[in-house]
C-alpha cells in the first residue's frame, strides 16, 4: 500500500504597489527550480492565512505587506505531494526588498504574467488577479 502523499497548505501574496504586482524567481536547484512565483510559503498549524502570508513575505523578502482579502484557493497535485494554495491580495507597505530565498524579483503589470514561466499551480491563480485581461 502506497504511503499517502504529504499535503501542504500554502499562502501566497499577490502584492500590489499601485498597479504593479511582485513576482519572485525560485533558486535554480531544487523543486520547480528557476520558475517564477508569487511570494509566500507554508501556513503553520493554527496560523491564520493573513498572518502566514505577512510572516512568510517578511522572512523571504524583508518587506511589510498588508493582507486585504483571500482572492482564490486552488488544489494541485504534484507527483510526490499535494498543495492547497490560498492567494491573498496584499498591499506593499514598507521595506527594501532583500532576496533571502529567491534569486530575482520583478514588479510587473498583471498581463505580463504570461511572459514568465510559473509552476502549474500558480498559473491556476492568474484569472483571479485584477487587470489580468
Predicted regions and their residues:
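Conserved N-terminal beta-strand and adjoining loop/helix that marks the start
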Residues: 1-22
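Acidic pyrophosphate-coordinating catalytic loop
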Residues: 3-4, 29, 73-85
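C-terminal lobe/hinge of AMP-binding adenylation domains
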Residues: 25-27
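A conserved beta-turn-beta hairpin within the catalytic core of GNAT-like acetyltransferases
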Residues: 30-35
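Short aromatic/basic micro-patch
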Residues: 37, 82, 106-107
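The catalytic Nudix box helix
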Residues: 38-72
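NUDIX/MutT-family hydrolases
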Residues: 89-129
